[in-house]
Amino acid sequence: MSEVQIVKSFLEELSKTPRNHPDSIPIEKIDETAISITIPAPLVEFQGNLALFEEKKVHVVAKTVRPPIQQASTEINVQSTILELKEVLASQLSTQPSSIRLMYKGKPLVNSRLLDDYVDADSVSEVNLQMFLMNIS
């Protein structure tokens, strides 16, 4: 007998005689206090490495490749998206985030990805990015 058949037969049996079934609970034994009781979690001291949960930040320096050379820098969490990074850089450069293209080690950075996808924060504290400013009119 498969698990589905066992469950079906149990439900059929329960629907035929719900009051007499051994798994049924009499309605008078159910009250609102039984339903709304909160069970506190046990207090256990954390045994792991707290450094895993700390926010890791890197210093990002983005510099244009072509003249006129422009530069922007910020301290940012590696769990930030590339779009969030572009928004910070754009505010410093007085431009739109959509006009900024960033590259790291020859690879374009995708807006929806995390900075952590490209940079290892454990081994790097400063990241130098190539920046391209597009003329959007």
Swiss-Prot record:
Pfam families assigned to the protein according to its UniProt record, in alphabetical order: ubiquitin
Domain Ubiquitin-like intervals: 58-135
Main subcellular localisation: cytoplasm
CDD domains registered for this protein in UniProt: Ubl_ubiquitin_like (cd17039)
Gene3D superfamilies: Phosphatidylinositol 3-kinase Catalytic Subunit, Chain A, domain 1
GO cellular component: cytosol; nucleus
Compartments in which it is found: Cytoplasm; Nucleus
Keyword list, A-Z: Cytoplasm, Nucleus
SUPFAM superfamilies (alphabetical): Ubiquitin-like (SSF54236)
Keyword Nucleus: yes
Segment forming the signal sequence: none
InterPro entries reported in the protein's UniProt record: Ubiquitin-like_dom, Ubiquitin-like_domsf
PROSITE patterns: UBIQUITIN_2
Tagged with keyword Signal: no
Protein name: Uncharacterized ubiquitin-like protein C800.12c
